[in-house]
Amino acid sequence: MKTYTYQNTLISKKQLKQLLSWSFTTYDSMQACSLADELKYLGFKYASKAGISISIEDLKVPYNKNLLLKIAHQEINSSEKIYLKGKLTDVERFQKLIDTWNLTSESLKDELVSYFKRYDPLNSVYIMAFSGARGNLSQVRQLVGMRGLMSDPSGELLKLPIKKNFREGLTITDYLMSGYGARKGIIDTALKTANSGYLTRRLIDVAQDIIIREKDCLTKHSCLIINFESNLRIKKSVYEKILGRLLNKSIYDEKTKELIAEVNTQVTPNLIRTLKQKQIKHFYVRSPLTCSLYRSICQKCYGWDLANENLIDIGERIGIIAGQSIGEPGTQLTMRTFHTGGIFTSEIRGTIRSPISGIVKFSKRLKRIPIRTNRGEDVLLTKNAGSLIIIPEEKNSKPVKLELFRNTVVFHKNNQYIQKNAIIAELVDDEKQTRTEIKPVLTTTSGEVFIPRIINKLDNINKTKLLWILSGNVYQAPQHSFLNFYNDYKINKNSYIFRTKLINDFSGFTVFTNSKYNLFQRILQLVSNSCWILPNSKIQKLQSSLNKKPYFLNIKKLKYLIDLKLLNSKYFIEISSNKHFGTLVTNNYQTLTGGIGYYDFRCRDRIISDNKTISYFLPWEPKKKSISLEFLTLLESQFLKSFDILSLILKKNPDLEDCRLAFFPNNFNLHSKVETFSHYSKQTNSLNLAWFSIVKQFPYRSVIWMSEENYELNCDKNLLLVEHGNFISKNFEIVPGIVSKTGGIVMISDKNKLTQEITIKTGSVYEGSLFNYFKNKIFYPGEIILDSLKITQPSFCECFEGRFNDQLLIRPLQVYEVPQFKSLIQIFGTKFQTDLPFNLTNNISYRCKSNKIIKESRNFTIIDNILDVNIRTFAKKQFEIELFSDVKKNHLNFLVSEKLSLNHFILPQLRYTDIQSCLLVQTHQFIDSYTILGYLEVMISKSLEIVQFKSKYKDSKQICLISNEDCRTIPKNSVKNKTIDNLLINNANVNYTGKILMDNDEFVTIQKGRPYFFPNCKNEEAIINTDLIYKPLQSSSFLDNSKLKTNRLVYLNYFDITKGLINQRIHSQDIICKFSKMFIKKNGKLYSSLLAGLINRIAIINKQLDSQQIPSCPTSIRKYREENSSKKLKKRMKRKYKKITGIKTLLFIKNSELNLNPLKDTQDRKNSLTVATFMLSKFYKFTGGIHSITEDYFDEEVNSVFCKNGEFVKNGQTIGLLNFEKEITGDIVQGLPRVEQLLEARKKKQITKNLPINKKKGLLTQTTSIDSYFEFKKLGTSIKENEKINPHNLLKVYFNYYGLIKTFFCENSYTKDSYRLFNNYEASYRSFKKVQSLILNSVQSVYKSQGVSIADKHLEVIIKQMTTKVLITHQGNTSLLPREVIDLYHIEYINKIARIHKKHPALYVPLLLGITKAALNNPSFISAASFQETTRVLTKAAIEGRVDWLRGLKENIIIGHLMPAGTGSPVYTNCFKKSFENNLN
């Protein structure tokens, strides 16, 4: 040791590290080794001599522990009382509890340390804690302080702390809590180690072929590293980042301009010292990310080998070293948290205390906004840096000035008195990792919601809401239920509160009842005592039935096939919506074969349906004889289309003489029902009611049928006896055993090899030429065609090309007339009862659709005559109709039975309440119609004295009973100045808190209540709680008549500007445009504009408008029209103003920043409004503006309240949601998955909150565009946990920014120009660089939070492998395929060749791959197959015919070659030189 000064300092672990590092750098490794050995022996020697042991006496508990615990208990009790008074939320109380215990634990620890330092510095416990070996202060705290708050397995905090320490001993409860909070030891370690090991494997696999192959890649790119210092605290030095790298640009002294270091100089500690002295802040260094080699890195870009602090050797396998360096700390960190056993620790915040007592004054520059902390304190947050002055009490003293940074929480207001050493302000910790969670607020009692009116203006501004729940019993009842009590009534146990009657429709007998307690299982079955008789009819069963309906019904001479169900030898009709009861057996509409039917489908659609009746108010005056109605107001146009001809039947009425409708003469039938509403017409005289019933009397209903025989045969083509295009006669054999029914042209089509489809188009064929005139025409009987051919029946002509001549096929048409169907009275001859709960109807059904081919060779029925059973009651499923024949009288009797399930009689929301049933009927009892069958009721479990009751109607009836149990009586003199309906908060006894119900001069009756507090609350009345509340203007005329005052109009225009800030002035109106930049950071959130459709803000200040009416001009929309000019290349636009009539103009009300009037008028600003107009342009697509690329869209979450004033709530009901920030305990258990997420480049699921009118959120676009507190943030900085940016999204955003074709506007000359910032390669390269820095910093921030330092170059090697691929979007003239993945350097090489040959290059977008995907996309298929998905990789490689060049380590080892690294690395330096012997020759 040449020059060594004597060190008289305490050498701890940190100093030992520095000592060894110094010796290693200054001397060689051998000397450093011997020094380490010497130190080791020295340590062991003195440890042996000291003989330090630990005994129970060394564990000294601080004497003031009990006092600290007592103070903590008092604080917690007081916060509990404040919570019950409704001044704190549940979340804030919990936070306060945590803070209190945390502070107690910390102060105990501080007491302990100060005691040891002062009185017992050689205490063995103290030595262990501060030795820097495996000991830790948190363990000492548990030994002699208090264990403190514990967390459960999911990381949630338990409210109860462990107050004891190990010296005092734990109770059983404490021990259980300790075990609950600690991680599950072995299992946890094993899992996490496996996880970490797998991460290491993937990292090595992705980078195993990265070797130092060359000395210099001659790259022009470099990384810029800036050493910047922020106002708040000086950031960690960046000099350690550049140690061991090579400079890519020379460094000059800024003042003297002399050269400090040249290009390619290695950055050594000496050079760093020089840079610090000269205060150089910018360095351009080389990095593995900037190296231009393919799948390898050059010596100069990598820099030092960190093992020996020399330039790395050629052939060094840096990929594997990088993988191990990143993966190994993961294994270390997983095992690190087990010493403390799940103890919660939170850092104490940095605070500013007042040095003197005095009055606080803020500077005018300091902008402050009121916020509420998570501990329930109303404080001020500074939006910019500024200062405050404390004016002292003593006259002679000087005022004290304190500087405050941005985002400082200030606890005192302006002009407020402050005492000495009181906390003035607290710094907001930016580095703290938090996540926002939502906690539902549940009621603890049932009762009525009461929201008192806000008297305090501050509460109104802060949007706080106080909600009382006044105690009471809440019941829900059906709407028409009868209540069984009054005020001051006493209800006994087991009596009912309300009742609802159950009444039947028709008379009959009860067949079945059950006495089940549950309402779901309670059933009552009734059978009607009267049957409906169908005369002259009987049911017969078919002997053998191919049909699904085996029974038929004989009525007179008609036979209907009917659908019956046989049950206990009784016939039942099964009721369902799509089934028909019976079908008439008739051959009238039967065709010989299949074919095509044509009819007017509009007729068919309306035959089945019932008569429609449309009610309409007819304003008419008695003097006028005619009424005219507009077409659209009367009927929907769709409804009218479905009718062909509507006939008019007019009922004569003295009030309505000659009512003709102006628009539909003879199309409507008009029933006047004025007499029913006579009281109505007498009052108004000018109004009358008329009903329009559309009567469907169709003069024609014909079906035209063109027959076509169709066979589908499973046979070989050789077996067919006919060929395609043959004309065959009737009864011709097609295949053996099958004969045609009609004659005509044969068409054969192959469905597949085995199935042949044969179609015979019926008709007669004529051969000849020039048949085009007859093609697709219809001829009628009596017409003559082809000179001599007379048509005998309606025919359709088709033309075909034959082998020799054209063929004309004349196909006969059959016309089926559909008659008016008879009513049932005409069929059955007698009237039937109308009082039954069902009726029979006679309908017609078409079995074929118009113009649709029916492929059939057998007979086919076109039209069915149908009997339908229609049910009138609502419970169709519970309905049965029984049929039985009376053979003597030849009658058929219909008997109705109804199964009543009581569950169907109440609303769905009441089904799960306590409603019970009580039936008054027995089995086999006769019941007349409209008899009370029973009741639905709710019984009471205990007797109550009712003080008051309230009921209200919604969907159901809600009842709130206030009984004597819900009230308290106190003497009147204890509550002075309070009247009825006043709220009372009792500080001493929380049970006597509530609302005053009665007052009898001596005593006061209080309804018990409990307040719930919701700060920063959203009102349901206001639609959106953002700066910009908007509502659409219905019409442009609204503004002209209104007297709302403003003097500022705001245009929110969509522009597409990519560079900086541009100020424009249009001289007529003084318009100033401010264009926002690419990335905007607002209150800790990053916003970006996708596709660069950025919003700008234009404030038009019209000085003449001082508190005048708004002119109607702002409701215009500017529209630009594009004009192509042939002379000039630039496209010019003309500006056009156009009035708007839709809802495109938005009206912004009460906006905080917009309406701050520059003229400062003193009028009430409640009426002020802002008109925003959007510019529409047709010739380019713009997006919806700025989207957030972070997890949260909005800076401050709003608490929600779900109940309104006067609403009745039940116990355990959710009445609102509270948002709160939760601190995440820094632990690699959260860290490892986060590293994995970043390196695997997982796509985060984006929660879509950017709906324009989303009630919970708000209008994002306008919120971000009109906000003065934008903060721009470089992407090179580390990002907090709650600002997780999706890297895929970021890559897309940047590529769009750099690579998309942009449109630029100039508003003065109205011109538009288009170009892009960079070409495709440059845009991809730059986008990749941005994402690389993001991933690098994100991974480093996770490791740094654990106190692990990894050299950047290791991560850079890995990240480079993730960001080399691109995805082809258009192949151009290259041989690539769309969506093919290829290396960026490769595609650039291909495109370069394409450009030389003047071909179209391929287009592509950058693609970010995770480490697994990157390893599988390795150019070596042997390496990829040995990693994962072996079969798939090898199959794909075999199909593609890929060649493996055996470049990496893995593939060479698998094949059995020498590893191409270290001594085995191939050197090609002499390959291209002539040999020495050749040179001699």
UniProtKB/Swiss-Prot annotation:
Reactions listed under catalytic activity: RNA(n) + a ribonucleoside 5'-triphosphate = RNA(n+1) + diphosphate
GO cellular component: a single term: chloroplast
GO terms of molecular function: DNA binding; DNA-directed RNA polymerase activity; zinc ion binding
GO biological process per UniProt: DNA-templated transcription
UniProt remark on cofactor binding: Binds 1 Zn(2+) ion per subunit.
Cofactor field: Zn(2+)
EC identifiers of the protein: 2.7.7.6
InterPro entries noted in UniProt: DNA-dir_RpoC2_beta_pp, DNA-dir_RpoC_beta_prime, RNA_pol_Rpb1_3_sf, RNA_pol_Rpb1_4, RNA_pol_Rpb1_5, Rpb1_funnel_sf
Main localization, broad class: plastid
Family: Belongs to the RNA polymerase beta' chain family. RpoC2 subfamily.
Function: DNA-dependent RNA polymerase catalyzes the transcription of DNA into RNA using the four ribonucleoside triphosphates as substrates.
Subunit structure comment from the entry: In plastids the minimal PEP RNA polymerase catalytic core is composed of four subunits: alpha, beta, beta', and beta''. When a (nuclear-encoded) sigma factor is associated with the core the holoenzyme is formed, which can initiate transcription.
Family matches, as NCBIfam families: rpoC2_cyan
Record protein name field: DNA-directed RNA polymerase subunit beta''
Species of provenance: Trieres chinensis (Marine centric diatom)
Record lineage: Eukaryota, Sar, Stramenopiles, Ochrophyta, Bacillariophyta
